[in-house]
UniProtKB/Swiss-Prot annotation:
Single GO MF annotation: haptoglobin binding
GO CC, any one term: hemoglobin complex
Domain of life, per lineage: Eukaryota
UniProt-recorded name of the protein: Hemoglobin subunit beta
Known function: Involved in oxygen transport from gills to the various peripheral tissues.
Species this protein is from: Notothenia neglecta (Yellowbelly rockcod)
UniProt: heme b binding residues: H63, H92
Family: Belongs to the globin family.
Tissues expressing the protein: Red blood cells.
Gene3D superfamilies noted in UniProt: Globins (1.10.490.10)
Additional free-text comment from the UniProt record: This fish has two hemoglobins: Hb1 and Hb2.
């Protein structure tokens, strides 16, 4: 993947200001609510019976934060994203059996929550760079499935 200086700067800036404790739980909760079939991977998280339960679930919140911090790996390794996520790709495909399409669904939810948080500062240029970054990470996470 070729990254322009502008794209690198945008990605670095977004993550340097990221409120992980807010965005992570909101993004994962949104994914579990909007795409309820994704809940099957979180059966050990307790009550996920409705939106209110998901939004108040401490396990969902903690995992959302963990997932969002997982993107730091990509930010720090933008030129070697596939290598950076090789181990996680293997874990999700061979042990957890996560449908790789779920990574795209979660990335869309992350984009929505980041856009809501940034408001008018989430310009088309910023969205383009952010979604490109997430698409590369999603592809890397799905690499083991190919």
């Amino acid at each position: 993947v070729n990254w322009s200086d502008s794209e690198r700067a945008i990605i670095t800036d977004i993550f340097s200001h990221m409120d992980y404790d807010d965005i992570g739980p909101k993004a994962l909760s949104r994914c579990l609510i909007v795409y309820p079939w994704t809940q099957r991977h979180f059966s050990g998280f307790g009550n996920l019976y409705n939106a209110e339960a998901i939004l108040g679930n401490a396990n969902v919140a903690a995992h959302g934060i963990k997932v969002l911090h997982g993107l730091d790996r990509g930010v720090k390794n933008m030129d070697k994203i596939v290598d950076a996520y090789a181990e996680l790709s293997m874990l999700h495909s061979e042990k957890l059996h996560v449908d790789p399409d779920n990574f795209k669904l979660l990335s869309d939810c992350i984009t929505i929550v980041v856009a809501a948080k940034m408001g008018s500062a989430f310009t088309p240029e910023i969205q383009c760079a952010f979604q490109k970054f997430l698409a590369v990470v999603v592809s890397a996470l799905g690499k083991q499935y190919h």
